[in-house]
Structure formats: C-alpha cells, structure tokens
Amino acid sequence: MEGKNEDMHTPRGPEDASNIADEYPSPERQQQGDMLGHDIHHHLDMHHERDARDTHSPGQTDMQTELAKQVAAQAIEAAVAHVQANADRQEAGGTEACGQVSNGNQRDIHMREEPHLSNSQHHPRQPVFPRSRQSFIALSPTSVATSIAGPSTLRRSPLPDTFSRSPAPLSANDQIAILRESYARNPNPDRKELERLAARTGRPWNKIREYFRQRRNKLRGLEQLEKMEEPGRASGWLQITYRSAPVTSQVPQLALYNSYRHRFDPYSSSTPLLGGQDLIQLACATFPGCEMARDDGEYVLKGLKEKDKEREDALGDNEAMGRKGREIDPEEWERGMEGLVEPLRAGSWLLSSFQSQPGTSGSDITQTDLYTSYAARFSSLLTGVSGTSNGNAHLNGHHGLSDEEAELRNHAESLKAFEDAGLGDTQGEEDQPPTVEESDQNETSPASFPADPNPLPQAPRESRLLTPVELINLTRMTFPACEPCVDSSGRFVIKGLERREGLEPGRKSREGEMFPFALMSEKQPGEEFVKVMKRKLASLHPDAIERRNAGESKRKRDDALTEEDKELIEGLKRFRGSKLGEQVRDVCVSQ
C-alpha cells in the first residue's frame, strides 16, 4: 500500500500530471482569465510562489516552454498597450507615418501570437506550470518597452517645422562688408574664390568680379593722386568721390573735410593738405550748382552727393534690398511731390524748401516772396486747366473770348494787388478762388463734354493752388515757431522762417555758412610721444648733452641783453596783454 501511495502521489509523466491537475485544481488555472488584463508586474509577484514548485517538476519541460510562450504573448500585449497609451498622450500631434509604423508593429505581434492563444484555448484541461526566472528577466517592462518603442522611435519622421531652413539672405551692408574684407586680403581673386564669395553673399560671381575690377581701377586712380600737388589732387579726389546733384541733396562740410583728411597723409611735407575753408571753396568751384548752406544748425553743401558705385555694382539692378538701402533720388522726390494734391503738395514743398530758425537775426522772408515762390513752382501744373476750359467754352458756345480775357485780367489784378500790399489787401484773395473754382467747375461739368460711347470711370483731380491766406495758415501749422507779423519797415513778413538753399535769389550770401575749421582744436601730443621725440632728437645731437652738462648753455643764457632788446621784450609783453593784441590774436586764429 505504501508503494501504491508513493506511485500515486509521485508524478511520473504527462498523464499523471493531468490527473493530479483534475483532483487538485491549481490556483493559477482559476485566475488565468483574470490575469489577462494585468501587466507584467503582477506576473513577477506570482513568480515567487511558483518558484518552490519548479524543483519538483523536472520532467515537464515541454509544457513549461509552451506556457512560457503564452505568458510572453500576454506580456507583449500588455507592454504594447501601455506604450501605445503613453505615446497617444505625449505625441497627440504626431505624424501619420509614426502611427502607421506603431500599428504595423502591433499587428505583427498579434499575428505572431495568435497560434499560441488558439492552442491554449483548445486545451482547457491543460495545467498551468511555472516558468523559469530567465523568461521573466527577458520579458521585463524595460526590455519590452525598448523592443516595442525602439524601432518606431527610430523610424519616426521629423515634424514639418523641424526641417532645416535656408539661412536668411544677407543685407546690402553685410554684402559690401564681406566684399571689402575679401578685397583687403586678395585684390585679384581667382574663379574658385569668386564662386565662394558668390555662395556666401548670394550674388552672381560675374557681378563680384566686376566689383573687384572697378574697385581696383578706382584705387589705382587714387594712388595716382598721391603724387600730385594741391589743389589738383583735391580737385581730382572730389571728382572721383562726389558728383553734382539737385539742391535737395546735401553733404555735411565737416564729413567732406574728414574724408579728405583721412584719405591722404596729413603729415606729408612735400604735399601738405588744404585747409577746410580752401577745400569747401574748391568743392563749390568744382561742381556747378554746389553752394554752402546751414541746414537745421548743420553746415552743409547743397547740390552735392557722394557716389554709390560700390553699392550699385555689388547689389545689381534687381535687388530689392539694395533699393531699400539706397538714398531717395531728389528728382524722383520732386516728381512725386507734383503728383500730390493740396494741401499735401504745399506742405511737402514747405518742408523741403524752408526751415524754422527762431533764434537767427537774419532777414525774414516776406509773405509776398513766399507765395510768389509757391506759385512759380506749381503754376506750370495749371496749364492743362486753362486749355481744357478753353476747349469746353468752344464746345458749349456759351462762353466767348471776352469771358476768358476777363477771368485772366481778374486773376492778374488779384496777384498784383497781393504783391503790392501783402496780406493787407483782401480783395485779391476773395477774387482769386472763385476764378479757379469756376475753371474747375467748367472742367468737371458733365454737360460740357460730348457723349463718350465707352466712358472710363475717373475721379476728378483737384489742380488748383492754395490762396495766400491758406498758404500762410499752412506755414504756421508746419512751423509752429514761425509767426506772421509786420516788421519795422511795414512789410508783411514771417518771423523765424528762412530758406534751406544757401543763396537767396537777389541777395548776398548769408554769414556763417562755412564751418569754422580754424576753431577745430587739434589733439595735443601725449607725454609718451614727447618723450620719444626728445630721445630721438638727443640721439641725433649727442654733443648737445655734453655741452648742457658742462654748463655752456647756462653761460649763454646769462649773457647780458642790450637795452634795445630789453625794451623790445617789454613792449611785446605790454602788447600781448592789450586789447589790440587780443584782436590780432583772434584774427590770426580765424585765418
């Protein structure tokens, strides 16, 4: 009996193991349905309870391997679900390709594990055997997550906004700085260097080659000027660097002189530099229309402009950034001002032609001169109005030549009355606007034009001039510091207003238009420079040191002066402290 009991309780094969499982159902077999929804950590906790039974089942290796596969499939499903949930929360805006890769991996895992799941479902009496510790280590959460999420992470395509963007194009000043730096290193670059600069600046290589060629020619011309004498050298430098321009363009006098002084050697004894006053006068004589002026407290040269060949050659004609960085052409400004309507046109003209100088003691502008200049500047734009009204009168047949002559006569009389009495006579001011307004009404009246089969919609354009009162009021609004008044001579003037041009028509040039170059304080040499020069002079004359040590210089100083020399020295001392001496010193400094 004992032998039978031992045979009964000692499992010897798969059949005995299945019988034992029927008599003593395993707790793992009852909880197998509940464990399908748990993760891998729950299996790790149950591993310690099954570890003790692992030593009593040495003959059940095949069943254990198959069960390990089933548990591995469950662990993989749980890991995939966990990783997919985290990926959905962290990367809600991920790309479609990433989702396809992860879904494909999950689909492959399900397809690989379906046979094991189906086999386990067809054997309900199959017992659950514990698996080895190595299987749990191989299927740890970190390893499973890495094996599942790793390939999808590597195959994930970058987001659209993370692609490498092309660098922003360089500005005009940056391109010129790069070209100048390259020219300083190598004035004659080869084809490879030109292509490298083209890739760096974004300009064609042939344009860069032309820039280098013109810069070599320009500097070659400046090198030839080094050997010339003044004033020919300064005149040639002015013609190379500057050009004539409209009066609206200007160059500061101090900037012009500093450019000239920095270009040539100021310490050359053979070809000394011109003074500031001589250079400014030479510039006015070299360029017709160039004149000295004072604009908003700054001494400038009107009608002069610096050449911009380097900028134009480096950037080309179709470069948008180059157009933004270039200076506005004064001629284009004048044409654009003519296209404006009143009072914008008159306001722009006032700002470009006059300036406010309340502290000056010069002659004020009369109101008659102001309106005469305004009418002379824009009266040519009214020629089309008179011609149109003439044609309209001829088409209508209601207005004869007598009416036109009367209108012109009234207009001339109003201007004459205004010029004679300034703003005191208001009769001309009242007569002038109706004349111009009547011409506008005749021009824009629909009955005066013949019927056009294809009329084009066009807005009527105002082409009249401002009245004297309107122009004076606009001047007061444009320059608040100015004030219309009557001077001591009984003239109607605008106090505190002066022209921007250097020379007023019919008058002498104003004082103080040239920069006071004589008052420019030169920098005093430093102590180190003085010490170096003393040592240099001492090395050139070593005998002077010996004589100084011997006391010869003292004996020469102690020589008695004659009475005439003493009287001369005393007279010079008195003259230096007198008012006449101060005046002479000021004149010498100013010259």
From Swiss-Prot:
It is found in: Nucleus. Residues 1-37, 148-168, 420-463, 543-563 are annotated as: Disordered. Residues 176-223 bind DNA. Its main location: nucleus. SUPFAM superfamilies: Homeodomain-like. One of its GO terms (biological process) is steroid metabolic process. Pfam families: Homeodomain. PROSITE patterns: HOMEOBOX_2. Induction: Expression is induced by nutrient starvation. Gene3D superfamilies: Homeodomain-like (1.10.10.60). GO terms for cellular component: nucleus. Residues 1-15, 543-560 have a biased composition (Basic and acidic residues). GO terms for molecular function: DNA binding; DNA-binding transcription factor activity, RNA polymerase II-specific. It comes from the Eukaryota. The keyword DNA-binding applies. Residues 427-441 have a biased composition (Acidic residues). Keywords: DNA-binding, Homeobox, Lipid metabolism, Melanin biosynthesis, Nucleus, Steroid metabolism, Sterol metabolism, Stress response, Transcription, Transcription regulation, Virulence. Disruption phenotype: Shows normal growth at 30 degrees Celsius but exhibits growth defects at 25 degrees Celsius or at high temperature. Reduces resistance to osmotic/salt, oxidizing/reducing, genotoxic, endoplasmic reticulum (ER) and cell wall/membrane stresses. Reduces LAC1 induction mediated by nutrient starvation and leads to greatly reduced melanin production. Markedly increases the basal expression levels of ERG2 and ERG11 under sterol-replete conditions and decreases the induction of ERG2, ERG3, ERG5, ERG11 and ERG25 under sterol depletion. Significantly reduced the virulence. General stress-responsive transcription factor that governs multiple stress responses and adaptations. Plays a key role in virulence. Mediates the expression of LAC1, which is the major laccase involved in melanin synthesis. Positively regulates BZP4 induction under conditions of nutrient starvation and basal expression levels of MBS1 and USV101, 3 major transcription factors that independently contribute to melanin production. Also acts as a key regulator of ergosterol gene expression. This is Homeobox domain-containing transcription factor HOB1. It comes from Cryptococcus neoformans var. grubii serotype A (strain H99 / ATCC 208821 / CBS 10515 / FGSC 9487). The lineage of its organism: Eukaryota, Fungi, Dikarya, Basidiomycota, Agaricomycotina.
